[in-house]
């Protein structure tokens, strides 16, 4: 499997936390050392609220930062935004570690055995199946035992890949 371009991975993450507007704003921010909200709005042709919403989402994940300067003419503040390139990789690594811990907790709760309905495909843990008297609550078919849990296998694969990514990124930081 070919390795993804780091910028594409970053933009994929930005898209997942801030949507397409977030990607547009982030790409534009990458072009400047810093830029005001007003300039961003004009450059991108977006509504000020949409730009601001995207910026706040990006800020929540430590991808961008801001500072303000008082406008001498009218006393209002002008907010300037920038990509904090120095802490960007550390923040992304921190997010990956948090996701990894959540996935590991989820993996611990997954059971090796599960029950499924052969008619409609719903899946149940042992406790859930027992609660339904081993009968599908949707269609009434008897539930069957499956020895290997595909969700658990998928989680194990994702956890392993994420651990490898984190290890690699820690070695280069």
UniProtKB/Swiss-Prot annotation:
* Parts forming coiled coils: none
Could you list this entry's UniProt keywords, alphabetically sorted.
Answer: DNA-binding, Transcription, Transcription regulation
State the Gene Ontology BP annotations.
Answer: regulation of DNA-templated transcription; transcription initiation at RNA polymerase II promoter
The UniProt subunit note reads as follows: Monomer. Interaction with RNA polymerase subunits RpoF and RpoE is necessary for Tfe stimulatory transcription activity. Able to interact with Tbp and RNA polymerase in the absence of DNA promoter. Interacts both with the preinitiation and elongation complexes.
What domain notes does the record hold? The winged helix domain is involved in binding to DNA in the preinitiation complex.
Q: What functional role does this protein have?
A: Transcription factor that plays a role in the activation of archaeal genes transcribed by RNA polymerase. Facilitates transcription initiation by enhancing TATA-box recognition by TATA-box-binding protein (Tbp), and transcription factor B (Tfb) and RNA polymerase recruitment. Not absolutely required for transcription in vitro, but particularly important in cases where Tbp or Tfb function is not optimal. It dynamically alters the nucleic acid-binding properties of RNA polymerases by stabilizing the initiation complex and destabilizing elongation complexes.
Do you know which InterPro entries this protein is assigned to? TF_E_archaea, TFE, TFIIE/TFIIEa_HTH, TFIIE_asu, TFIIEa/SarR/Rpc3_HTH_dom, WH-like_DNA-bd_sf, WH_DNA-bd_sf
The entry sums up its family as follows: Belongs to the TFE family.
Give the source species: Ignicoccus hospitalis (strain KIN4/I / DSM 18386 / JCM 14125)
Which positions fall inside the HTH TFE/IIEalpha-type domain? 6-89
Name of the protein described by the UniProt record: Transcription factor E
Encoding gene (name): tfe
Q: Cite the GO molecular-function annotations of the record.
A: DNA binding
**Which PANTHER family does the UniProt record give?**
GENERAL TRANSCRIPTION FACTOR IIE SUBUNIT 1, TRANSCRIPTION INITIATION FACTOR IIE, ALPHA SUBUNIT
